[in-house]
Amino acid sequence: MLPATFKLCAGISYRHMRNMTGLRKNAMVAIHHELNMLAGPNPSSWISHVRRRSSLLSSRIEEEQGYNEAEVSYVKQGEEALQKSISILGDQDGWTTEIIAANGDKVLSKVLPDVGKVFKLEVLLDQRSDNLYVELVGNMEQMGDWNPNVKEVKILQKIGQETMVTHEVSGPTPGNVVGPRDFVSVRCAKRRGSTCFLAGMSTQHPTMPEQRGVVRAENGPTCIVMRPSADDPNKTKFTWLLSIDLKGWIPKTIINKVLSQTQVDFANHLRQRMADNSVSMEMAAAC
């Protein structure tokens, strides 16, 4: 029903910071240092390092990459989205259990005053994080092939190696409980050390106005974090923060059930996709 990946918070432009030349080099170093800290073992250390310098983003982006104003805006939205998500994930208090599956997959939720209700999927996957990153980022447009909750994902624009704007169309829900929805999202994909981050938020793009017969939903904050398991580097601790406004007159009880179940379903579909990929590789090697 929903794009099975990652989208996220509200970006802030900070236009007044763009021309502060002296901050550009320091901003770039600081942001990269903060994200490297996220790959460390202690989740509580994420926040103190990530919150501080969001106001320095635009000057380093424009100077170092040479992007135009629209591209800078997309990159900033993705960067801010990542910071907002990590802040939410770093706060371990106040989470309520929604689902605990038989295999240990867990969905938690929390209500935030500036965001609304957010959901957090926590699973352990028998895959290396590098392989998962390739599937979810490198093969993003193939998601509709293996996830029935997603009809289509299309990349509208790429900005550098870490930012893209996408259009996603949701798949049908059982009984058509929730009608067709689509999303235009900016996505930020980063790898720092052995940890992978996939974040995003709703945005607008001139090539994809609202479509007739489809409700344009909004998402954010959303982020996937993939870290090797401390017990086995061939397994991945997979966390997915999800926040979506489906729009329309849908009872909250239905929305909550649909969103939490969507996360559980996504984990199962992803496992099956990766298992199928492994079989295909083994068959190719045997030929």
Swiss-Prot record:
GO cellular component, one term: mitochondrion
SMART domains documented for this protein: START
Origin organism lineage: Eukaryota, Metazoa, Chordata, Craniata, Vertebrata
Keyword list, A-Z: Lipid transport, Lipid-binding, Mitochondrion, Steroidogenesis, Transit peptide, Transport
Pfam families: START
Organelle transit peptide: 1-61
Name of the protein this chain belongs to: Steroidogenic acute regulatory protein, mitochondrial
One GO molecular-function entry: cholesterol transfer activity
Gene Ontology BP terms: cholesterol metabolic process; intracellular cholesterol transport; regulation of steroid biosynthetic process; steroid biosynthetic process
Quaternary data: May interact with TSPO.
Domain of life: Eukaryota
Principal place of residence: mitochondrion
Pathway annotation: Steroid metabolism; cholesterol metabolism
UniProt KW Transit peptide keyword: yes
Catalytic activity: cholesterol(in) = cholesterol(out)
Entry annotated with the keyword Transport: yes
Locations listed in the record: Mitochondrion
Function: Plays a key role in steroid hormone synthesis by enhancing the metabolism of cholesterol into pregnenolone. Mediates the transfer of cholesterol from the outer mitochondrial membrane to the inner mitochondrial membrane where it is cleaved to pregnenolone.
Domain (START) ranges: 66-279
